[in-house]
């Protein structure tokens, strides 16, 4: 079994899989609602510019918002210290699976903070699913213990 995501759809873009969706990935400890105003502004600007409608999504990460909490097994297993060393990779797979299940091959991925970690992992594991990345207030290295 894989990690399940709760996808929040701001606009479905007419379900036109010839367009490229924008997937907004929230940070920790918030959920998709952090993107509400941004998604509305993005949609409104696209309409004003005459851009063909495209999907705008903001899936909740597991355990955030309406995101179901996966089992330890679905998360890739837990180390003796309680860490989930494969958790981020499994989440990246789940986001790409969601994209493909909707009939899209690529997305524009936007990640804030921990969402940036996730979309960098998507780029590493699934570069074919990336049309573009927007990294917001994030970094490529993991947080330190400090």
Residue ranges and their predicted role:
Residues 17-18, 48-54, 128-129:
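Short helix-terminating capping/connector loops at secondary-structure junctions
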Residues 30-31, 64-67, 141:
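Active-site loop signature of alpha/beta-hydrolase-fold enzymes
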Residues 105-144:
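Conserved hydrolase catalytic core segment
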Residues 19-27:
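Short beta-strand element of the alpha/beta-hydrolase
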Residues 25, 59-61, 136:
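Alpha/beta-hydrolase
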Residues 2-12, 37-110:
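Active-site loop/oxyanion-hole signature of alpha/beta-hydrolase fold enzymes
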Residues 27-30, 113:
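Active-site glycine-rich loops that stabilize anionic/oxyanionic intermediates
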Residues 30-33, 37, 117:
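Short alpha-helical
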């Amino acid at each position: 079994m894989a990690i399940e995501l709760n996808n929040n759809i701001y606009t479905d873009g007419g379900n036109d899989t010839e367009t490229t969706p924008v997937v907004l990935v929230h940070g920790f400890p918030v959920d998709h609602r952090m993107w509400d105003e941004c998604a509305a502004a993005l949609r409104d600007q696209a309409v004003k510019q005459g851009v063909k409608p495209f999907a705008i999504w903001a899936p909740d990460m597991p355990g955030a918002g309406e995101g179901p909490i996966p089992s330890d097994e679905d998360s890739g297993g837990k180390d003796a210290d309680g860490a989930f060393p494969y958790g981020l990779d499994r989440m990246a797979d789940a986001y790409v699976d969601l994209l493909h299940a909707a009939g899209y091959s690529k997305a524009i991925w936007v990640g804030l903070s921990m969402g940036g970690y996730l979309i960098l992992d998507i780029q590493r594991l699934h570069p074919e699913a990336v049309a573009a990345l927007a990294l917001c207030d994030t970094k490529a290295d993991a947080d330190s213990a400090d």
